[in-house]
């Protein structure tokens, strides 16, 4: 685990009120997703995107309008396209797609291996399959019409691991002065983790008490 987990573990040894980090970081088979950025290199994939979105992905306007989930995907694959160009220096003819899978340890529907073992090209092939690209065209499009950079995120859903009261410390534990916890693994009432707002709220509570 990273230095952040080690820091929390060392602090937690001092007092039970400081939480139980091992509840969240001890089993990456239960807390990982895999994310990938697919960038189109020509026009060949775009018609399949347009058929689903009913929008031109290079219009500079809303494209998917949210996340598109492939409900029959063994990987539970989802994808989304934000307004293009997404990056300042992005080529106006290219489209950047965010693809991710929740089940990284099961074989895909087109690529018969787990997502976590796949190359960027293979992830692209699986995505194209769920876009409805004819199977005899998938390999060529993945090879020549897109580039894919995958990223494994081992703790992305650690926030949602089963827990009990006390596994997350209060922002300001009882008796603490000039010491606070902030971020996604602290307790704060009436809010839900996995948002920037949660981190900001806990930081505000830490400052203002």
Per-segment meaning from a language model:
Residues 1-209:
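C-terminal segments that line or cap access tunnels to active or ligand-binding sites in enzymes
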């Amino acid at each position: 685990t990273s230095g952040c987990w080690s820091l929390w573990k060392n602090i937690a040894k001092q007092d039970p009120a400081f939480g139980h980090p091992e509840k969240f970081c001890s089993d990456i088979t239960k807390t990982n997703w895999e994310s990938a950025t697919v960038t189109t290199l020509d026009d060949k994939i775009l018609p399949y995107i347009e058929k689903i979105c009913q929008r031109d992905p290079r219009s500079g306007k809303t494209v998917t309008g949210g996340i598109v989930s492939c409900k029959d995907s063994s990987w539970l694959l989802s994808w989304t396209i934000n307004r293009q160009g997404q990056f300042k220096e992005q080529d106006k003819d290219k489209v950047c797609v965010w693809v991710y899978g929740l089940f990284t340890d099961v074989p895909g529907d087109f690529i018969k291996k787990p997502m976590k073992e796949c190359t960027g090209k293979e992830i692209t092939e699986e995505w194209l399959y769920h876009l409805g690209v004819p199977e005899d065209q998938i390999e060529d499009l993945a090879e020549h019409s897109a580039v894919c950079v995958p990223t494994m995120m081992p703790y992305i859903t650690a926030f949602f691991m089963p827990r009990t009261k006390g596994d997350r410390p209060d922002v300001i534990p009882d008796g603490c002065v000039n010491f606070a916890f902030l971020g996604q693994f602290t307790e704060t009432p009436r809010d839900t983790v996995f948002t920037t707002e949660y981190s900001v709220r806990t930081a505000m509570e830490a400052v203002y008490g």
